[in-house]
Every structure is written in structure tokens, then in C-alpha cells.
Design a protein with these regions (language model features):
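Conserved N-terminal segment of class I S-adenosyl-L-methionine
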Residues: 1-120, 124, 141, 238, ...
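S-adenosyl-L-methionine-dependent methyltransferase catalytic module, highlighting the catalytic core
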Residues: 5-7, 18-27, 31, 135-143, ...
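Short, low-complexity intrinsically disordered segments
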Residues: 58-61, 116, 151, 179-183
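Active-site micro-motifs of SAM-dependent methyltransferase domains
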Residues: 111, 132, 163
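A short beta-strand submotif of the Rossmann-like class I SAM-dependent methyltransferase core
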Residues: 127-128
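A conserved short alpha-helix in the GNAT/GCN5 acetyltransferase fold that borders
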Residues: 131, 145
């Protein structure tokens, strides 16, 4: 991992003093916090999203580094939800260690309606690298909208399925997982190949993503059908998170927006800033 920005390193140093926070969680929190403070918060503010005094929810929060960065922008309330109990436990420990107040809960946005206290409650909702795992994109957006205030903001980021590693083949932990564009193989060959993965759960995940195949075009249609206002769309050759993970600067690919096919193959990230109608 490249050298972290000073502000991020201070947070990582704080949680390093805790024996109950492992190196895996420190790593993921560190790059998430860096992404939130160096890119996501400045981007949202540049688009007119008010973070100070805002109620903010991240769906699929992981180790909640992004939430921590947004909390430091003066948010009134931050809530992280995830399907994994370990992620929730880690987030609670990390927030305690860095002295930030947050609420965390296990919640499935597809099968569970939001609790009354969350319904129509949030000014800002984030879905980072989550929506591509949800089987019905439009329905998922509608469920997320239940959490949002009228006029609330939704920030969505995902790797298009046909981008070099959009099939999440890195999960396979085998030689195949190191190769780009394996999702372009015919179904019989692709299926035979990914079933050689070491872990059954990873086989299931890659298979599910194969069924969903979330593309830029599919995402645009889902946004339109869900009646969300599209405020901004950004495409990237190199994702902003690569700066934190690998030291590679973000490179935009917005000129591909109007080139069907090529945009799906070449853009490693698509991000959307959306707004719920008043």
C-alpha cells in the first residue's frame, strides 16, 4: 500500500493501538478513509451536496472509513449498514478508537424495510461497490430511496461488468482470477473455468454477478425508471481508489459516455450522483 496522506495515517495510527482491531481492518479502514477525505467529500461538496449538519447513511459500509471521513465534515449523524456482522463489529471498534460517533446495524435493504427511524431520514446515502451485487438494479434503487429524504442525494459507484475485472474474478484466488476480460468467454467455458475456484462462496458470488451483468447502460435505464434525477455521471480508466491502494492517480474516461460498447469495456468505474425528487 502506498504512503497514506498525513490525515489518514493519523487515523490508522490511532486504531493500531487497539489489539482487538486486526491488520485487515486497519488496511481497509485506511484506504476507505483516504478515499472519503481525499476524493468523495470534496467531490460531493463541489456538486452542491451539503455535508455539514447532514444525516448520512452508507449501505455496505465495510470498515466505515468513508463514513468516518464524512463525519469529520460536520455531519449531524452517520449510519453504516452491512450484511456482515464482522464488518459491523469492526466499524464500532474503529469509531470508538478514533473518537467518532456513529451507528451501525446489520440490515438487508432488499428483504427488510427500513426501520421507521430511517425511513425518509437521510440527506445523503452512499452505495460504493455494492449495487453490482444486487440482483434487480431498479428495484434496489427504489428500496434505497425509502431511506432518503425528498431532495436527498444518492452517490453510487460500481465497476461495469464488462470492464477488465468487472466479473470480480479476483475473488477466485486462482490463475483465472488474474486475467482480465474472462467474462467475455462463452458461458460454458466461463462456467467451467470459475468453478475451479478454491472457495464455494466465491464461485457463487462470481456466478451471481454473471447473472446480473450490471453495465453503464443498464444503470442509466434503472435510474430513469426509478424516477431519480441524474445530477452527474463520471467514468474512469483508473479508479480514484487506486490512488490509495496502488499510488496510481485517477484518470477520467468521460469522453466514452456517448460511445456504447467501448465505454463498457474500457471504463473501470462508473459513478453517479443522483437526487430524489422533492
Amino acid at each position: 500500500m502506498p504512503k497514506l496522506p498525513p490525515r489518514t495515517q493519523k487515523k490508522v495510527d490511532l486504531i493500531a493501538t487497539r489489539d482487538d482491531i486486526n491488520s485487515y481492518d486497519r488496511y481497509y479502514f485506511g484506504y476507505q478513509y483516504g478515499l472519503g477525505s481525499e476524493y468523495i467529500a470534496p467531490y460531493l461538496k463541489s456538486e452542491g451536496v451539503k455535508l455539514e449538519g447532514a444525516t448520512i447513511c452508507e449501505i455496505g459500509c465495510g470498515e466505515s472509513g468513508v463514513l468516518a471521513a464524512l463525519a469529520e465534515e460536520g455531519a449531524a449523524e452517520v449510519v453504516g449498514i452491512d450484511l456482515r456482522d464482522l464488518a459491523i463489529q469492526s466499524s464500532e471498534k474503529i469509531f470508538e478508537a478514533v473518537g467518532i460517533k456513529g451507528e451501525f446495524a446489520i440490515h438487508n435493504i432488499i428483504t427488510q424495510p427500513p426501520p421507521d427511524k430511517w425511513r425518509g431520514h437521510f440527506d445523503v446515502v452512499l452505495l460504493r461497490d455494492v449495487i453490482e451485487h444486487l440482483e434487480e438494479t431498479e428495484l434496489s434503487l427504489r428500496h434505497v430511496m425509502d431511506f432518503m429524504k425528498p431532495g436527498g442525494w444518492l452517490y453510487v459507484v460500481f465497476p461495469p461488468y464488462y470492464s477488465p475485472f468487472g466479473a470480480h474474478q479476483h475473488l477466485l484466488d486462482n490463475t483465472l482470477g488474474k486475467l482480465p476480460y474472462i467474462q467475455l468467454l462463452p458461458d460454458p467455458i466461463f462456467t467451467k473455468a470459475y468453478k475451479k475456484a478454491r472457495l464455494h462462496i466465491d464461485v457463487e458470488e462470481v456466478s451471481m454477478l454473471r447473472g446480473i451483468r450490471l453495465t453503464i447502460g443498464k444503470m442509466r435505464r434503472a435510474i430513469k425508471n426509478a424516477l431519480l434525477d441524474l445530477v452527474d455521471e463520471q467514468l474512469y480508466f483508473l479508479r480514484p481508489v487506486f490512488k490509495l491502494k496502488f499510488g496510481l492517480p485517477p484518470i477520467k474516461a468521460n469522453f466514452l459516455k456517448h460511445i456504447p460498447g467501448l465505454r463498457e469495456l474500457a471504463a473501470l468505474e462508473a459513478s453517479y450522483l443522483l437526487r430524489k425528487k422533492l
